[in-house]
Amino acid sequence: MRILVLSFYYPPDLGPGALRAKSIVDALIEEGPSNLKIDVVTTMPNRYHSIKVFAPKYENENKISINRIVLPKHKNGMFDQVKAFVLFSFAVRKLVLKKKWDIVIATSSRLMTASLATWIAKRTNSKIYLDIRDLFTDTINDILKKKFL
């Protein structure tokens, strides 16, 4: 069984998103079948600008392979986040080309990561599981109140 886990953050990156993604992968390893193979696609650690964390671009350990996509340094403004996600999206699409999974899992505080995972699942005829950590409907009003320029 092959599973793709798509997460913008993954250890050694810091924060709740990285920890949650790692918990999902750990649970899958513990409870999954003996033929389980998990492909994690994430970014290089980039959550906090003041903390430099090293991570290899590619790791392969036991049943898990991790591909980390390098993104340019960015701030946390909306424009920078959109730019980072667009670059992440293009890199993910290139990386998953001609690959197949039984299940695609996305853990995301961004609806765009979930939509990217849904696109991959449809394209590969895989089952999709979404773990959305942010209630978009609760936060959209706060986002729209901020000035963009």
Regions inferred by a protein language model and the residue ranges of each:
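N-terminal subdomain of nucleotide-sugar transferases
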Residues: M1-S65
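Acceptor-binding helix/loop patch of EC 2.4 sugar-transfer enzymes
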Residues: F8, L71-D80, K98-K99, S126-L149
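Short, well-ordered beta-to-alpha junction loops that form the rim of enzyme active sites
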Residues: F8, T107-R110
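A cross-domain feature marking catalytic cores of carbohydrate-active enzymes
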Residues: T42, S108, I132
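An amphipathic, basic-hydrophobic alpha-helix
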Residues: R68-I103, M112-R123
